[in-house]
Amino acid sequence: MKTFVLVSCLLVFTQIIYALDIKEISIMNRILEKCIRTVPKRENDPINPLRNVNVWYCAFTKRGIFTPKGVNTKQYINYCEKTAISPADIKLCKKIASKCVKKVYDRPGPIIERSKNLLSCVLKKGLLELTVYGKKK
């Protein structure tokens, strides 16, 4: 029985560790800190800077996910694999990200505006809460 419990615990921890890309999270944390400091604060910005579309736009632009030509869709959706907390969260994260990409990029408009609308969509649908960033303040 003890062996079964130990193996079960190891499987759970392996899934959690597998789901997170610690190196990428560390890089993104440094980028987010810089973006939080440099993005001008506006009157209607949320108290938590991680809920600010402009902060995420800054960070994803620095990571090369948002470019002048638009969003690198594959890289954006696969970012869920690097930051989602559990395998179930990865699946839901990808689903939300895919729906928002389709919804936003099927419409005409400037690339920057569409990229920010994409971020607004995923934040409103709760994608952040599925990742390690949902736990930060």
Swiss-Prot record:
<keyword id="KW-0732">Signal</keyword>
<feature type="signal peptide">
    <location>
        <begin position="1"/>
        <end position="19"/>
    </location>
</feature>
<dbReference type="GO" id="GO:0005576">
    <property type="term" value="C:extracellular region"/>
</dbReference>
<keyword id="KW-0020">Allergen</keyword>
<protein>
    <recommendedName>
        <fullName>Venom allergen 4</fullName>
    </recommendedName>
</protein>
<dbReference type="InterPro" id="IPR038211">
    <property type="entry name" value="Ant_venon_allerg_soli_2/4_sf"/>
</dbReference>
<keyword id="KW-0964">Secreted</keyword>
<dbReference type="Pfam" id="PF22750">
    <property type="entry name" value="Sol_i_2"/>
</dbReference>
<dbReference type="InterPro" id="IPR055216">
    <property type="entry name" value="Sol_i_2/4"/>
</dbReference>
<comment type="similarity">
    <text>Belongs to the ant venom allergen 2/4 family.</text>
</comment>
<comment type="subunit">
    <text>Monomer.</text>
</comment>
